[in-house]
Each structure stands twice: as C-alpha cells, then as structure tokens.
Design a protein with these regions (language model features):
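Short helix-capping/turn signature of helix-turn-helix
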Residues: 66, 126-133
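N-terminal intrinsically disordered/low-complexity leader segments
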Residues: 1-25, 215-221
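Helix-turn-helix
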Residues: 29, 33-75
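Hydrophobic alpha-helical connector segments
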Residues: 75, 89-119, 169-176, 221
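Short, charged helix-capping/linker segments at alpha-helix termini
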Residues: 44-45, 161-169
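Amphipathic alpha-helical packing segments from all-alpha helical-bundle domains
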Residues: 90, 116-125, 135-161, 171, ...
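Short, basic, alpha-helical segments at the C-terminal edge of helix-turn-helix-like DNA-binding modules
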Residues: 78-84
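Amphipathic C-terminal alpha-helical segment
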Residues: 110-116, 133, 158, 176-194, ...
C-alpha cells in the first residue's frame, strides 16, 4: 500500500478509495457529479475540476477514471442514454399488450420521478441545445433515437390497425415526440414552470387529439 501511495497521482486518501468503493460505483459517482455540473454550468463550461469538487474528490481521481474531459462527457451521455432507454423499455415491458396500453406506457415513462428531474432535464437540454454538444449527442445517441422513433411509429401504426384510426404513423409519432421534448424544455426555461404531472397531461391532451376514443388528458380511457 505504501508503494501505491508513493507512485499514485491520486494521493494517499484517494489511492485508498478503490478499496472502499468498486470501480464501477466510483465511476457512477463521478458521472452523477458530471450531470450536476452540466445542469448547473452548461456543457461547454463543465470542467474536470468542477466535477471533482461536486463529487468531493480529487481532480486526479477524475483523471484516473476518464483521462480527458471528452471521455467524461461521452461516458456521461452514454449513461443518460442507457438510463433513458431502460426507463421506457421497462415500462412498456410491464404494460399490457394492447397498442393503447403500450403507447401510454412509452410516453408516460418520460415523466416518472426518477427520470424527470430538473437536473437531468437540464443536462439533456445542454447536450441538445449547445452547439458544442450536438455533434457528441448525434454521434453517440443517433441509433437509440432512431430505435425509439421506430417503436413509437410502430405503436401509432398499431393504433390504426387495431382500433380503426387512419393517421400517418410517422407524422403522428413525430408530433408526440416533439411535444414531449417541448414540455421538457418548458419545464427548464419558463419563469414559472409547471411540474411533471401537468407536462404529462399536456402530452396526453395531444395524444387524445389523435386517438380520442382511447386517451384523454388524464391518460388512458
């Protein structure tokens, strides 16, 4: 242990930390701190030093796990993307098999308390909205976005097929997606923002305009 402390850039206290916390758990702690910093300072002004301060750890430990700011931001984005993917897929898997039940579960998942927090919404908006963050987002999240869109289009097509609607599934899915993104943005930018329940009711009002026999502002009929 003495030799490790002598040669480690982390210092004695930080060098001992991996013995107390598994590597994956420490990385997750640093990624969560990065989400907090991005939400507070924006994408371009996030630094490894700020992340270290937010986590209460040394800059050397952040560098040990991620080497560069770009790596840290990529890993943070991938973490958020995986969290989002797991959120909506687990909700649809737990829902009933009908098209309306599946559609509700997929859309309502965006407003669950674990996901729909000011910090996470701010981080997403930073990756979307800041010019320096968009290439990183497009490169690392494009495939998952395409899969999400395809699944949403499929559910809209099923609503046509199973319930007698006659809508363009691609355009309908697009409207539902941009409405979700719009209320997320509202919650981050309005001087007096509404909360997740009102945001979900706004989206469900949009869904009800397309599928009035199956949805209302309250959700499934």
């Amino acid at each position: 242990m003495a030799a490790l402390e002598k040669n480690s850039p982390l210092g004695p206290a930080e060098a001992a930390l991996p013995r107390k916390m598994p590597r994956d758990a420490r990385r997750q702690q640093l990624i969560e701190a990065t989400i907090e910093v991005i939400a507070k300072s924006g994408y371009s002004r996030t630094t490894m030093s700020e992340v270290a301060r937010m986590a209460g750890l040394s800059h050397g430990l952040v560098n040990f796990h991620f080497q560069t700011k770009e790596n840290l931001l990529i890993e943070t984005l991938l973490y958020l993307s995986e969290e989002y993917h797991q959120n909506w897929t687990s909700e649809t898997e737990a829902a009933g098999p009908g098209a309306a039940e599946q559609l509700y579960a997929m859309l309502a998942a965006d407003f669950l308390p674990a996901l729909c927090t000011p910090t996470r919404l701010s981080a997403w908006c930073a990756f979307w909205g800041e010019a320096s963050g968009r290439p990183l987002y497009q490169e690392n999240c494009g495939e998952r976005d395409a899969a999400y869109n395809l699944h949403l289009e499929m559910l809209c097509a099923r609503m046509n097929r199973e319930h007698g609607y006659s809508l363009d599934p691609v355009r309908t899915a697009r409207v539902l997606r941009v409405t979700t993104e719009g209320v997320w943005l509202d919650m981050m930018t309005m001087q007096q923002p509404y909360g997740p329940e009102e945001a979900k009711a706004t989206l469900m009002s949009c869904v009800a305009a397309f599928f009035p026999r199956h949805f209302s502002a309250a959700g499934l009929i």
